[in-house]
Amino acid sequence: MLFFLNFFVLVFSIELALLTASAAAEDGSYEIIILHTNDMHARFDQTNAGSNKCQEKDKIASKCYGGFARVSTMVKKFREENGSSVLFLNAGDTYTGTPWFTLYKETIATEMMNILRPDAASLGNHEFDKGVEGLVPFLNGVTFPILTANLDTSQEPTMTNAKNLKRSMIFTVSGHRVGVIGYLTPDTKFLSDVGKVNFIPEVEAINTEAQRLKKEENAEIIIVVGHSGLIKDREIAEKCPLVDIIVGGHSHTFLYTGSQPDREVPVDVYPVVVTQSSGKKVPIVQAYCFTKYLGYFKVTINGKGNVVGWTGQPILLNNNIPQDQEVLTALEKYRERVENYGNRVIGVSRVILNGGHTECRFHECNMGNLITDAFVYANVISTPMSTNAWTDASVVLYQSGGIRAPIDPRTAAGSITRLELDNVLPFGNALYVVKVPGNVLRKALEHSVHRYSNTSGWGEFPQVSGLKIRFNVNEEIGKRVKSVKVLCSNCSQPEYQPLRNKKTYNVIMDSFMKDGGDGYSMFKPLKIIKTLPLGDIETVEAYIEKMGPIFPAVEGRITVLGGLQKSDEDWH
């Protein structure tokens, strides 16, 4: 009963308080409820607040979120209560991000998506992570259409012949013909393994298909669902005159109106509205990522086929939302192998990986260098190449308190297991790219050593990549940063340059630091540019697998004058 009461209060509150662009309805008007998800990244099971594994301590504290079971509960409830007025759309990137997908790939993705049963989905770039051969079984196995209008699959016949891959579909919603068109960023050819698939620019493909749907299929309105990011969605809204509503993904953008419901800071209001040159207003929605929210967007269409009003907000899928038993039962046959995944050897190290308290909280440590370099690498390989920049984020700032254990591979012929890595990084935090002014970065570095002493190690002491820092902890607090050099990103050859207070830097950090953890409150109001596809432990795991055997060193990234001197004992 509590759930149903909360549910009705939630929907009533949305309807009452969040009406943002209503207009007087004319005769013949109707309503459509659009439910939407994007960038779920294999969060089939519930997660913690940072969208990684929900640990036992999180369950005890009722701090588990999302998962397909909670999405399913809400979708089923909306469909039961609202019937044919509901249109459930998914904007891609179901693949990649957890051991569930690593182990079971398209098999589990197909089964889980068929339980959710969206009316339609677009492809995401990560759907190509296992190549065309890893995507086609998914396209043939799902029981709903996958819409992507801007693909040229003529050189990949298995894609051309895929059962459920289409450019668009007509749906009857609230008794009216609604055209839905899908799209995918052409950057996918740089981000994943697309084989011989080619791409048409989104705007061109959408305009062509929208004209066809209007002329040949008698579509009354046009909704596009796709995976190109908020910046491109704004362009689509501006340059596609027949498009009425955009459901987006790819940029992992949290849009929200009002006070944030959890740790995610809204990038903009929900929906973002673009006004075309004709005066037509086009709303854009997106629902963050990782199944933590379900997008809810209710629109009013008048008798002329114009969007005249809307209301809605992403719904936080927290512990108050029950988990659908159908999903939980389906997951059980996969669970044991996933739980045993910790025993798997993920790589080899030729050196001790020092994550000890007396090393990483007083000095640069090689475990810190491994972790931060892995974050930089993960961002590089997920970012399109540029003629001017080798990456969009060359700097990582990571709190040493997040490093909880060393790994001594001498005990197992150099082998590193997933369980050992879990012990090093037990918190399961998301990774963000955050736009940080130079003066704020300097302030953060001052904070990182404001409590430094030779007797107590504090968690805020930094581990870094892309920085060379010189501290003097004998100086007064607030004046301990003596010099900082930053590895350039917008350059053809990386080199270290002095930190400039008035310059803005893209910095990779975890969700704990972004939320102000360990006293880093200066980062809380800053905007998140994007969320990396994998969490902290999955990112480091992938890096070790790719680069092994590894042998990270202490390289002089951090110099601490007046600090605790290293001893050989710290390495054992």
From Swiss-Prot:
Mention any Pfam family matching this sequence: Metallophos
Record-linked SUPFAM superfamilies:
5'-nucleotidase (syn. UDP-sugar hydrolase), C-terminal domain, Metallo-dependent phosphatases
* GO molecular-function term, one example from the UniProt record: nucleotide binding
Q: Which InterPro entries match?
A: 5'-Nucleotdase_C, 5'-Nucleotdase_C_sf, 5'-Nucleotdase_CS, 5_nucleotidase/apyrase, Calcineurin-like_PHP_ApaH, Metallo-depent_PP-like
Substrates-to-products reaction catalysed = UDP-sugar + H2O = UMP + alpha-D-aldose 1-phosphate; a ribonucleoside 5'-phosphate + H2O = a ribonucleoside + phosphate
One GO cellular component term noted in the UniProt record for this chain: plasma membrane
Q: Which residues form the signal peptide?
A: 1-25
Write out the residues that bind Zn(2+) 2: D93, N125, H227, H250
Listed PROSITE patterns = 5_NUCLEOTIDASE_1, 5_NUCLEOTIDASE_2
Glycosylation (residues): N82, N454, N490
Keyword Nucleus on entry: no
Q: Which UniProt keywords apply?
A: Disulfide bond, Glycoprotein, Hydrolase, Metal-binding, Nucleotide-binding, Signal, Zinc
Residues reported to bind substrate: R361, Q399, R404, F427, F512, M513, K514, D515, G516, G517, D518
Q: Between which residues do disulfide bridges form?
A: C54-C64, C360-C365, C488-C491
Q: What Enzyme Commission number(s) appear in the record?
A: 3.6.1.45, 3.1.3.5
Q: Where is this site: Transition state stabilizer?
A: H126, D129
Q: Which residues bind Zn(2+) 1?
A: D39, H41, D93
Q: Give, as one word, the top-level EC class.
A: hydrolase
- Mind listing the GO biological process terms from this record? AMP catabolic process
- Which cofactors, by name? Zn(2+)
Transmembrane regions: none
Question: What is the similarity comment for this entry?
Answer: Belongs to the 5'-nucleotidase family.
Q: So what does this one do?
A: Degradation of external UDP-glucose to uridine monophosphate and glucose-1-phosphate, which can then be used by the cell.
Record's protein name? Protein 5NUC
**Which organism is this protein's natural source?**
Lutzomyia longipalpis (Sand fly)
